[in-house]
Amino acid sequence: MSLITVENLSVRYGANTVLRNVALTVEPGEIVTIVGPNGSGKTSLLKAIIGAARPAAGQVTLRPGLRIGYVPQRLHIDATLPITVERFMGLTARVTREDCMAALKIAAVPDLLKRQMSQLSGGQFQRVLLARALINKPDVLLLDEATQGLDQPGSAAFYRQIEDVRRETGCAVLMISHELHVVMSASDRVICLNGHVCCAGTPAVVASAPEYRALFGTGTGGALALYRHDHDHNHDHDHEAAE
């Protein structure tokens, strides 16, 4: 059974329809990236999946018992608030130090447990958010522009870490990004969204799709130069451009 199934989903805010007739699935262990221009409905789609936005039509079905880890687009913490990484990770649920350490290790920042949140660099902060999302051993990670504010090397390092997380934990990943040249290389499937699904498939299929090039131009073809994903598992998702 698919982890997440979205069927004919439409989302409206007042009279404004931001998503219409969107359909997609997320299968166990795969990395799916949603790309699209600003205002294309990417964040609204994630909100509908986690129940933070009510569909105007269609439905979202989660596999029974599905555990979701969520890494938000941004999170502001008052710099004057004295809070350690360990305390931050236990704010919303009771967790042991061992759980914190295990999650931080998977996120490749095992030495930050006692560090003040206000002292973290941008990259360290995002990895702590990743560790917090991993602490309950999710079946799927949802990432909403999780590298916003990082420079290109920092973003690339973060997405490489996401691949490592998938290999180590087996969890699926559904992520939103505008950094096409980086995330293309880390994805099993790419879904191009602009209020509806323009095209979907492997990075190679999507990068050559007319719908994708109409939105992003031909210059993004360089994304495929980074397409170094070497699978040790199979997904039957080389599907054609969607209407």
Swiss-Prot record:
Family in the record: Belongs to the ABC transporter superfamily. Zinc importer (TC 3.A.1.15.5) family.
Q: What does this protein do?
A: Part of the ABC transporter complex ZnuABC involved in zinc import. Responsible for energy coupling to the transport system.
What species was this sequence derived from? Jannaschia sp. (strain CCS1)
Could you confirm whether the keyword Zinc appears in this record?
Answer: yes
- List the membrane topology term(s): Peripheral membrane protein
Top-level lineage group: Bacteria
Protein's UniProt name: Zinc import ATP-binding protein ZnuC
GO BP annotations, alphabetical order: response to zinc ion
Question: Keyword Cell membrane: yes or no?
Answer: yes
Assembly and partners are described as: The complex is composed of two ATP-binding proteins (ZnuC), two transmembrane proteins (ZnuB) and a solute-binding protein (ZnuA).
Any GO molecular function: ATP binding
Give the EC number.
7.2.2.20
Family matches, as Pfam families: ABC_tran
Q: Which reaction does it catalyse?
A: Zn(2+)(out) + ATP(in) + H2O(in) = Zn(2+)(in) + ADP(in) + phosphate(in) + H(+)(in)
Concerning PANTHER family, the annotation shows:
METAL TRANSPORT SYSTEM ATP-BINDING PROTEIN TM_0124-RELATED (PTHR42734), ZINC IMPORT ATP-BINDING PROTEIN ZNUC (PTHR42734:SF9)
Q: Where does ATP bind?
A: 36-43
Subcellular location(s): the record lists: Cell inner membrane
Keyword set for this entry?
ATP-binding, Cell inner membrane, Cell membrane, Ion transport, Membrane, Nucleotide-binding, Translocase, Transport, Zinc, Zinc transport
GO CC terms of this entry: plasma membrane
Using the record's annotation, list all stretches that form the ABC transporter domain.
4-219
